[in-house]
Amino acid sequence: MNYEEILQTVRGFCAREKLLDGKKHLALAVSGGADSMALLRVLLELRETFGYPLTACHVNHGLRGETADRDEAFVRAECARLGVPLTVFRPADVGMTVPPHAGEDWARRLRYACFAQLLAGGIDCIATAHTATDQAETLLFRLARGTGLHGAGGIRPRRPGYCRPLLGLTRVETEALCAAFGQGWVTDETNESDAYARNRLRHGAVPALRSVNDAAEENLARFCEKAARADAYFARQAEQLLSIARLDAAQTARKAPKAKAAWRLEPLQDTDPIILEAALHSLVAPVRDAEEKYIRLLAELVERGSGAVQLTDTV
């Protein structure tokens, strides 16, 4: 696709998913990489169409020494050049310190702590630069670990406080967009390391799939969209099921005095397995990552009618 076609793809995706409608103040998470720099330029182009004020934020995790400082300096310079207000975060700004063996999970928690501070301070949406390539990698990663329909839905285009305008583009297309704008970017050297499972998929599985079909990433991302729609439907059915099965306060106090809530087994045992799975997912998700193995264990428990499953140290 050429520049105009890529821009139109993003515009159409944002309009279809209602990602930018009515945003009072939009903040873009900018790492300095090609994806986030492409999103910065796209959001500047679309600002007039959707009418949102735009600011940027950058998180210096403090993990990569001089190259992290280089990335921060690059983002500062580019935002100043483009006239975009920028907020830079470091761990101490949100009351966090770098642990001895900080990894991807810690870095993600830091980023979302920074985003939460912005949302609490008046920003009503954080735009992140996830792409169709990220979507494909996420799907493969979850399938390899074991996932259900909810996990197969991948990265959602939006959730409260967040939107992902580039989910319709591949990483090749974001780099092409940067080239069309004459926009430079920086490269995080940790993305080249196969020490991380996601990077091994990025360097091995995704290119192998692309060799089978040039549109492999787009097709995997499209599958995620379909899975997410199916998951949303079954979640609505599950909500109705749990409402029917739930005991009232007096019944709960009598049958399960230590429980905050309880449900009758019969409706759960009589329902379709995929609706039961959706119901169990909604119950598990608030207390831990709803991995497939826990849903499966709980489904077996419902079928048996008695027993226990340990989900966390306290649940």
What are these regions (language model features)?
Residues 1-207:
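Core alpha/beta nucleotide-donor-binding catalytic domains of modification enzymes
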Residues 3-35, 53-59, 91, 110, ...:
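AMP-forming adenylation/ATP pyrophosphatase catalytic core
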Residues 145, 149, 171, 210-214, ...:
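Alpha-helix boundary/capping and short turn/kink residues
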Residues 191-198, 217-228:
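Internal, active-site/partner-interface "lid" segment
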Residues 203-220:
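Conserved anion/nucleotide-ligand pocket segment
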